[in-house]
Amino acid sequence: ESRGLGDVYKRQMLAQGFQERGDFAKSTTYLREAIAAEQDAVQKELLLVRLSMTELAAKNPTAAAVAANEAKALNPNNGMAYFALAQAYAASAASCSGLEGQAIFWVAYDTMTQAANLLANDADAGNFAQTARDAAANYRRGFPTAEECFFNELMEGARYTITCGPARGIVTTVRPR
């Protein structure tokens, strides 16, 4: 078992080194290997959040969302998993056209607000709760305007299902900017 722990640690260190050099492909490969070898759920959860953030840096929002959701599944109270997930949703908005790209910000906002709430109750989170609140406020600026909602026949308060990107299938609430 100690050999396994050494292997996990070695992979983490290799991932860190490649990440520092900007080689995100190799970094994520080693992080995935470390996750596969990790037996401790708490450590696996931390590695998944790290993988999500590395995938974001590599401009892979879908892979980032998958890793963040896996971390969330291990611990639904992990504010950092929500923090990474919200960023993944927001990063994917540019790949969705028109109103759909703006609608993703509803989900990013909701997810980042959840992150802020969870991080505010986490003594180890430092300033991340405020960073999450600031990011949520920024995502609000991406919401469609009242006019855009009107022309797309969307009523404020109505339910809306995202149809693009890693947030596809998530139901949210229509809100103008």
Name these PLM-found stretches.
Residues 1-9:
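Single conserved hydrophobic/aromatic residue that forms the stacking wall/gate
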Residues 42, 56-59, 86, 91-100, ...:
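Short coil/turn linking the two alpha-helices of tandem helical-hairpin repeats
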